[in-house]
């Protein structure tokens, strides 16, 4: 059966979301049609607002609606430690843990030559520039996911930082191979940070 064009377009739009297949997209489209008009308007406004008002912090790459994110602008954070993560959602996981009070640097991806993602496509250059300009940093924690891409990215960054004589550490074993940091519980993350090892 062919759906009317507006419904087909909405189904197609939902299918662009990760993990959403045609059946789920169709259910969401019909659910959206049954929503009160005000809820649909609020939903569409929220989508537009996120695209218009959220940007990357120019210092660390975290997402923010301010000029500089709350973490970078907080003088009470430990200025001597920077934790490098893949995505803002990983940063949020460590913040929810509540044990780490240093700074962050968000790469927005990992090296993946097969996908055409090299050092220029993620925030590696800005990390090195940041370290060169900041003498306060004594340790960089590489908190990347335990995937082949995450491992190779960690080794690449480690080699770039070593000449600066800054301590480079990585999370302790405890996160299962291939698992995402965002799904790890707070206790696992806390142990991984506390037991971090030098590279």
Curated annotation (Swiss-Prot):
A zinc finger (C4-type) spans 57-72. GO terms for biological process: DNA recombination; DNA repair. Residues 80-176 form the Toprim domain. GO terms for molecular function: DNA binding; zinc ion binding. Disulfide bonds: none annotated. Pfam families: RecR_C, RecR_HhH, RecR_ZnF, Toprim_4. May play a role in DNA repair. It seems to be involved in an RecBC-independent recombinational process of DNA repair. It may act with RecF and RecO. Belongs to the RecR family. NCBIfam families: recR (TIGR00615). This is Recombination protein RecR. The lineage of its organism: Bacteria, Bacillati, Bacillota, Bacilli, Lactobacillales.
């Amino acid at each position: 059966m062919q759906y009317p064009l507006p419904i087909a377009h909405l189904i197609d739009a939902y299918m662009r979301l990760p993990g959403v297949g045609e059946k789920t997209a169709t259910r969401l489209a019909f659910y959206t049609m049954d929503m009160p008009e005000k809820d649909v308007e609020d939903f569409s406004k929220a989508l537009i607002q996120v695209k218009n008002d959220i940007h990357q912090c120019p210092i660390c790459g975290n997402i923010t609606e301010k000029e500089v994110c709350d973490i970078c602008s907080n003088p009470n954070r430990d200025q001597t430690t920077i934790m490098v993560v893949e995505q803002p959602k990983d940063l949020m996981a460590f913040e929810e843990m509540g044990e780490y009070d240093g700074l962050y640097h968000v790469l927005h991806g990992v090296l993946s030559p097969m996908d055409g993602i090299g050092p220029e496509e993620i925030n590696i250059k800005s990390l090195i520039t940041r370290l060169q300009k900041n003498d306060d940093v004594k340790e960089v924690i590489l908190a990347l996911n335990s995937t082949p891409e995450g491992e190779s990215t960690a080794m690449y960054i480690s080699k770039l930082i070593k000449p600066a004589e800054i301590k480079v550490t990585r999370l302790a074993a405890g996160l299962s191979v291939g698992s995402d940091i965002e799904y790890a519980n707070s206790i696992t993350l806390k142990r991984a940070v506390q037991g971090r090892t030098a590279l």
